Curated annotation (Swiss-Prot):
GO cellular component: plasma membrane
Transmembrane segments: 6-26, 154-174
The organism of origin for this protein: Methanocaldococcus jannaschii (strain ATCC 43067 / DSM 2661 / JAL-1 / JCM 10045 / NBRC 100440)
Name the record gives this protein: Uncharacterized protein MJ0288
Compartments it resides in: Cell membrane
Main location, first listed in the record: membrane
């Protein structure tokens, strides 16, 4: 019986220690996860397209937010990306809309990501805040397709010749049977 009481007491102490210890985690949320853009080149280039990415801090502590681009979105000669609000702090539970402008300069298809890095705020010398060294990186996929109303002369001529040939052949067959 003494052995049972000792084990029960030890388990109770372990449970109480686990219950009062604090565990901190880091998370974040972004919307939308994907941005698809279609640009009509017949309206002329360059063209500006605006979009918004919403960043939310679901944590109980403030976080730093930094946004960077990858892939084709880094080629400023063809497409330029302007992130209007970058390197900012979010309070616990706060959501912010970040305006983004894509300036498409050349006709092509572009793919890349806008990476949103969320990391805890450093509370200074006294370190009273969250002691996390981790960061969370959330990607937003971006696909830009540039289309135009170019007239493909060669294809149109071939199509017209085929249609006229079929109509002529049909007319000859109808005459023969009449």
């Amino acid at each position: 019986m003494k052995k049972f009481s000792a084990i029960f007491g030890l388990l109770s102490v372990i449970f109480v220690i686990m219950a009062i210890s604090q565990v901190s985690g880091l998370s974040g949320a972004i919307t939308p996860p994907k941005i698809d853009i279609m640009v009509n080149a017949s309206n002329g280039l360059p063209q500006d397209i605006n979009s918004i990415i919403y960043v939310k801090n679901p944590n109980s502590f403030p976080v730093k937010v930094e946004m960077v681009t990858t892939g084709d979105l880094n080629n400023s000669k063809k497409v330029e990306v302007k992130i209007m609000k970058n390197n900012f702090t979010l309070k616990p539970g706060e959501t912010v809309g970040v305006n983004i402008t894509f300036t498409v300069k050349e006709k092509d298809n572009y793919e890349g990501d806008i990476l949103t890095k969320i990391s805890p705020v450093d509370y200074g010398d006294d370190k009273k805040g969250v002691n996390l060294k981790a960061s969370v990186v959330l990607p937003t996929k971006v696909a830009i397709m540039v289309v135009g109303n170019e007239i493909h002369t060669k294809e149109l001529v071939i199509t017209a010749v085929l249609i006229i040939s079929i109509l002529g052949l049909g007319a000859m067959l109808i005459r023969r049977h009449l």
